UniProtKB/Swiss-Prot annotation:
Annotated PANTHER family: CADHERIN-87A, PROTOCADHERIN-1
Gene: PCDH1
Protein name, as recorded: Protocadherin-1
Natural source organism: Homo sapiens (Human)
Subcellular compartments: Cell junction; Cell membrane
Key word Heme present: no
Job description of the protein: May be involved in cell-cell interaction processes and in cell adhesion.
Tissues/organs with expression: Highly expressed in the brain and neuro-glial cells.
Topology Extracellular: residue spans: 58-852
Top-level taxon of the source organism: Eukaryota
């Protein structure tokens, strides 16, 4: 095909178009004596129908011989691609300086820079047989439809011509051959090299010898790994003494047409006998080497063996026919055969190192062997992606900047971005993105690109607006998939060109001006300004005024500054406000305008009270908040303006507990709330404006304090020092003790959970998590006898929860005959850490034995003392009865000693004055003979206050021989039953409960006449209550049946009430 530009078509050029649908189109120019190959018209029409649509990415491949003269036509894109000859703009994006493109026809020509296949950088490190490819890109813009440019990718396959002569590395080649060499032995001759490829490379070798060597030597060419290896074959017996060297000529010729040839002198030196040649362990070696390996890194070690001895077996290793690049990068140890790195290895420059290693012995006539070594260079992620940004279509770039009008359509291409990575595999898989929040995105320009080389269109995503953003700095980031990944960035500045698309905009669409009445004419009311986001004349503004009918003739405006003046005096009583319309027009073409409204309010006097937004405020806050914490916020408004609307807030009817911030209306507390002390606060807020005279308003505020879990549960029963007898006959599931506790918090913070935290090694007992009732879960065995100390934990459900701990002593035995032992066990329990179970403790058992001995001694002393005390008491009581004239069985109705709990005891053990949970006392019994009863029992009369009823206190220390007081009262006294209430636990140290009566005389129960206490019966039960004044305690209570404890928060000594 002839060029319309005067160029000539490359005779051997061939076209291959790649794209959907895929097809191949070949054209051949007529050669000497041949005719041009023409396609049938039907096939041509079919190709036009099947040509790839403009929206698809297309690749075109041309095959061109190297060294073509300038202006040689390679191909016509318009004809080959199916575009019309007019209406399109063709632009060469990639391919200079070897190619040029006609902008109208799309014809591709060669340039003054000749395409030399051997000189192209892309083809210098190719493996034999690989094609030499020169890539180019052409953008095609439809000037008629003014659409986005299309990118056409193409390749020039540069075909080799025979322009290089094959040559040997040296004009003289020397071979040393021992004299005892067997006939048929082969000796390799160094290869000749030819820079051409394929058929134009080395094709044949020819040996030329003189008469003396013609019968001794021959040439044999072996095909080895796509190369022809010339070998000298020994055809006769050699005699060094007869002839020690021969000069031969070896000729090499390529396969070009016409062929090229050269020759070299082959000098054969005959050596003395060394009959064994070295032999490599393997005929060939393969190794992998990571690029950028350090100097001295071991690559591979070749090893050969020689059956000779002495110097003939000493092997020396050398490179054989190794290219210069191998000798520069690798080092071969002559003695060990170890190959190490001696230069920087870069896979991107050379991916495979192929060479031979010669092993030669040190004999007089050295023998040698050759092994092939192939080193594959492994890729390392040592190359960051490269990003190239250039213009596309009608958008040109200069100094890294592109100009584009703000009214362009969406998805307009601004630039062509090419991203590539010199690595391979995952290290070359590049991901490219636009960084930052900019209205631009990357769209893939070609679907045929590899992972290591991709092209994108940088296009807009939304309409551009000069008034919002005048320029963009687009940063493009490319990251490969290596480990660790490498990245690079490049940026493009896009300058947005302004068009008059914005109307003037006022600072405020509505401006309200307060202007006093009785003003002077000509005074300035306000200055109204507008702005235009455009630039130049598009932003020059002119102001005008369009007042409402009522304001016509009263106001005027400056066209240049927008200053509004009043022309006459205003009178508020005639009109309170005026509405003015201000127009601002720019000087663009066509002109755009904007409007604003000015409301002129005539000022008035202070005639409005402040007003709270609500008629009353109710806030809820958590207790224990730190002082100066906000508890609520109020809002107050004033219908006036200026100082008349400046409101000051203050707290009324308050003790300094609260303050208020005038700026925010926030109410702050000056104390930390405690709900248990006070749950509600009420006060008033006062608002006063700044008018003259001032106006004020009031509002009520209520603060409700919400509960926080700041109180731990406290144990009301039993005492830590109390105990209970548990006989082996106790039934399973029977309640053996009851733990009671209280919590001064509320809600879930006061919901209690009971659990046994320790002291239950045998699993005999279980506690109700909600009831606190301890029940027997296993049958009592002999090994279970003794004192069991249960550590009961009582926790609430607060977050975080709080807890209290109680000790429950259960004495498993048949009887309580040995009280001294029990008291010793209890003392040991109180001195034992809670994490030790006293039940089954060997040390504890030994203390029991020691207690038994001590009990025996004490029991004897107590028995004697009891007998003496009983005799004295009986005699004394009889004398008292005779003197008082007491008559048994007579009932008195007078209330002698009505118990009243003291004020201090009722407060319990809470330091913050929380509510007491003590039980209410039962109505007391009246007795007529007050003096007789007091003298008979030796009670100490104590009174809480002048108005309190007298209270009877039992003596705290009884002699060991004290009589059975229950039997004495039953037979000789008309007193009602006496109840002793078990003492509740104390928050301090250890607590003891006074046992006032001997074990044999103790009655346990609620006053039932059938209840038993040891061997005796009594009509009277007892109950202990805390006294107002503390006393010393010396005893411990015990019970034979299930107790019914009455919880009480008081601590101290026991006081007894006489009730009926």
């Amino acid at each position: 095909m002839d060029s319309g530009a005067g160029g000539r078509r490359c005779p051997e050029a061939a076209l291959l178009i790649l794209g959907p649908p895929r097809m191949e189109h070949l054209r051949h120019s007529p050669g000497p004596g041949g005719q041009r190959l023409l396609l049938p018209s039907m096939l041509l029409a079919l190709l036009l129908l099947l040509a790839p649509s403009p929206g698809h990415a297309t690749r075109v491949v041309y095959k061109v011989p190297e060294e073509q003269p300038p202006n040689t036509l390679i191909g016509s894109l318009a004809a080959d691609y199916g575009f019309p000859d007019v209406g399109h703009l063709y632009k060469l994006e990639v391919g200079a300086p070897y190619l040029r493109v006609d902008g109208k026809t799309g014809d591709i020509f060669t340039t003054e820079t000749s395409i030399d296949r051997e000189g192209l950088r892309e083809c210098q490190n190719q493996l034999p047989g690989d094609p030499c490819i020169l890539e180019f890109e052409v953008s095609i813009t439809d000037l008629v439809q003014n659409g986005s440019p299309r990118l056409l990718e193409g390749q020039i396959e540069v075909q080799d011509i025979n322009d290089n002569t094959p040559n040997f590395a040296s004009p003289v080649i020397t071979l040393a051959i021992p004299e005892n060499t067997n006939i048929g032995s082969l000796f390799p001759i160094p290869l000749a090299s030819d820079r051409d490829a394929g058929p134009n490379g080395v094709a044949s070798y020819e040996l030329q010898a003189g008469p003396e060597a013609q019968e001794l030597f021959g040439l044999q060419v072996a095909e080895d790994q796509e190369e022809k290896q010339p070998q000298l074959i020994v055809m006769g017996n050699l005699d060094r003494e007869r002839w020690d060297s021969y000069d031969l000529t070896i000729k090499v010729q390529d396969g070009g047409s016409p062929p090229r040839a050269s020759s070299a002198l082959l000098r054969v030196t005959v050596l003395d006998t060394n009959d064994n040649a070295p032999k490599f362990e393997r005929p060939s070696y393969e190794a992998e080497l990571s690029e950028n390996s350090p100097i001295g890194h071991s690559v591979i070690q070749v090893k050969a063996n020689d059956s000779d001895q002495g110097a003939n077996a000493e092997i020396e290793y050398t490179f054989h026919q190794a290219p210069e690049v191998v000798r520069r990068l690798l080092r071969l140890d002559r003695n060990t055969g170890l190959i190490t790195v001696q230069g920087p290895v870069d896979r991107e420059d050379l991916s495979t190192l192929r060479f031979s290693v010669l092993a030669k012995d040190r004999g007089t006539n050295p023998k040698s062997a050759r092994a092939q070594v192939v080193v594959t260079v492994k890729d390392m992620n040592d190359n960051a992606p490269t990003i190239e940004i250039r213009g596309i279509g009608l958008v040109t770039h200069q100094d890294g900047m592109a100009n584009i009008s703000e009214d362009v359509a969406e998805e307009t291409a601004v630039a062509l971005v090419q991203v590539s990575d010199r690595d391979e595999g995952e290290n070359a898989a590049v991901t490219c993105v636009v960084a930052g929040d900019v209205p631009f995105q990357l769209r893939q320009a070609s679907e045929t690109g590899s992972d290591s080389k991709k092209k994108y269109f940088l296009q807009t995503t939304t309409p551009l607006d000069y008034e919002k953003v005048k320029d963009y700095t687009i940063e493009i980031v490319a990251v490969d998939s290596g480990n660790p990944p490498l990245s690079s960035t490049n940026s493009l500045k896009v300058q947005v060109v302004d068009v008059n698309d914005n109307a003037p905009v006022f600072t405020q669409s509505v401006t309200e001006v307060a202007f006093p009445e009785n003003n002077k004419p000509g005074e300035v009311i306000a200055e109204i300004t507008a702005s235009d986001a455009d630039s130049g004349s598009n932003a020059e503004l002119v102001y005008s005024l369009e007042p409402e009918p009522a304001a016509k003739g009263l106001f005027t405006i400056s066209p240049e500054t927008g200053e509004i003046q009043v022309k006459t005096s205003l009178d508020r009583e005639q009109r309170e406000s005026y509405e003015l319309k201000v127009v601002a027009a720019d000087r663009g073409s066509p002109s755009l305008q904007g409007t604003a409204t000015v409301l002129v309010n005539v000022l008035d006097c202070n005639d409005n009270d402040p007003k709270f937004m609500l008629s009353g405020y109710n806030f809820s806050v958590m207790e224990n908040m730190p002082a100066l914490s906000p508890v609520g916020m109020v809002t107050v408004i004033d219908g006036d303006k200026g100082e008349n609307a400046q409101v000051q807030l203050s707290v009324e009817q308050d003790n300094g507990d609260f303050v208020i911030q005038n700026g925010t209306g926030t109410i702050l507390s000056s104390l930390s709330f405690d709900r248990e002390q006070q749950s509600t606060y009420t006060f008033q807020l006062k608002a006063v404006d700044g008018g003259v005279p001032p106006r004020s308003a009031y509002v009520g505020v209520t603060i409700n304090v919400l509960d926080e879990n700041d109180n731990a549960p406290y144990i009301t029963a039993p005492s830590n020092t109390s105990h209970k007898l548990l006989t082996p006959q106790t039934r399973l599931g029977e309640t053996v003790s009851q733990v009671a506790a209280e919590d001064f918090d509320s809600g879930v913070n006061a919901e209690l959970i009971y659990s046994i935290a320790g002291g239950n090694p045998y699993g005999l007992f279980q506690i109700g998590s909600h009831s606190g009732a301890i029940t027997l879960e296993k049958e009592i065995e002999r090994r279970h006898h003794g004192l069991h100390r249960l550590v009961v934990k009582v926790s609430d459900r607060g977050k975080p929860p709080r807890y209290g701990t109680a000790l429950v002593h259960l004495y498993v035995n048949e009887t309580l005959a040995n009280r001294t032992l029990l008291e010793t066990l209890l003392g040991h329990s109180l001195d034992t850490p809670l994490d030790i179970d006293i039940a089954g403790d060997p040390e504890y058992e030994r203390s029991k034995q020691r207690g038994n001995i001590l009990f025996g001694v004490v029991a004897g002393v107590v028995a004697v003392a009891l007998l003496i005390a009983l005799a004295v008491l009986v005699r004394y009581c009889r004398q008292r009865e005779a003197k008082s004239g007491y008559q048994a069985g007579k009932k008195e109705t007078k209330d002698l000693y009505a118990p009243k709990p003291s004020g201090k005891a009722s407060k319990g053990n809470k330091s913050k004055g929380k509510k007491s949970k003590s039980p209410k006392p039962v109505k007391p019994v009246e007795d007529e003979d007050e003096a007789g009863l007091q003298k008979s029992l030796k009670f100490n009369l104590m009174s809480d206050a002048p108005g309190d009823s007298p209270r009877i206190h039992l003596p705290l220390n009884y002699p060991p021989g004290s009589p059975d007081l229950g039997r004495h009262y039953r037979s000789n006294s008309p007193l009602p039953s006496i109840q002793l209430q078990p003492q509740s636990p104390s928050a301090s140290k250890k607590h003891q409960v006074v046992q006032d009566l001997p074990p044999a005389n103790t009655f346990v129960g609620t006053g039932d006449t059938t209840s038993t206490g040891s061997e005796q019966y009594s009509d009277y039960s007892y109950r202990t209550n805390p006294p107002k004044y503390p006393s010393k305690q010396v005893g411990q209570p015990f019970q034979l049946s299930t107790p019914q404890p009455l919880p009480h928060p008081y601590h101290g000594a026991i006081w007894t009430e006489v009730w009926e």
